[in-house]
Amino acid sequence: MSRVGKMPVTLPQGVDVAIKDDQINVKGALGALALTQNALVTIKNDAGKLTFAPANDSREANAMSGTMRQLVNNMVTGVTKGFEKKLSLIGVGYKAQAQGAKLNLTVGYSHPVIMDMPAGITVATPTPTEVVIKGSDRQRVGQIAAEVRAVRPPEPYKGKGIRYADEKITIKETKKK
């Protein structure tokens, strides 16, 4: 059995999990999330602990039990604490402004780039060169952060662009004659 799948998911106070048919619904202080249950995994709710087991002895079911356990664990963490990604803008004149549910980026193009944030995702700019993306769904927070970074990815010679706060960019040396 998968090592990750063996560990139960402990449900904190104030988190409700409902398993109906093939749908898993998690409700908490920061919202509600839903996930479709895989047929290869059986889930049991035992007094505040969710246990995951493969439905059969196949290798795929074993792997999927660990995957489902981690997805549900991320949902529980998301509705209690939430997730956030920090991005930093490096470059002369590069700045960001949060305008409600929109993010306005000035990153060296002839026009500002305006990005709409989907429901459930909040964006903040503590300083003009920092962007903080928060939400309860880990996958969506990471996806939106990747889309913001893709507007102007860091270039390898000077390192200018939008990067994750903890990302290390290796700077290349310029060509010598």
From Swiss-Prot:
Alphabetic keyword roster:
Ribonucleoprotein, Ribosomal protein, RNA-binding, rRNA-binding
A biological-process GO annotation: cytoplasmic translation
Cellular compartments per GO CC: cytosolic large ribosomal subunit
SUPFAM superfamilies recorded: Ribosomal protein L6
Secretion signal, residue range per the UniProt entry: none
Q: Name one Pfam family in it.
A: Ribosomal_L6
Which InterPro entries does the UniProt record give? Answer: Ribosomal_uL6-like, Ribosomal_uL6-like_a/b-dom_sf, Ribosomal_uL6_a/b-dom, Ribosomal_uL6_bac-type, Ribosomal_uL6_CS
Is Disulfide bond tagged as a keyword?
Answer: no
Recorded GO MF terms: rRNA binding; structural constituent of ribosome
Q: Which family does it belong to?
A: Belongs to the universal ribosomal protein uL6 family.
The UniProt subunit note reads as follows: Part of the 50S ribosomal subunit.
Quote the function comment for this protein: This protein binds to the 23S rRNA, and is important in its secondary structure. It is located near the subunit interface in the base of the L7/L12 stalk, and near the tRNA binding site of the peptidyltransferase center.
Concerning HAMAP family, the annotation shows: Ribosomal_uL6_B
Tell me what this protein is called.
Large ribosomal subunit protein uL6
- Naturally occurring in which organism (per UniProt): Polaromonas sp. (strain JS666 / ATCC BAA-500)
Gene name for this UniProt entry: rplF
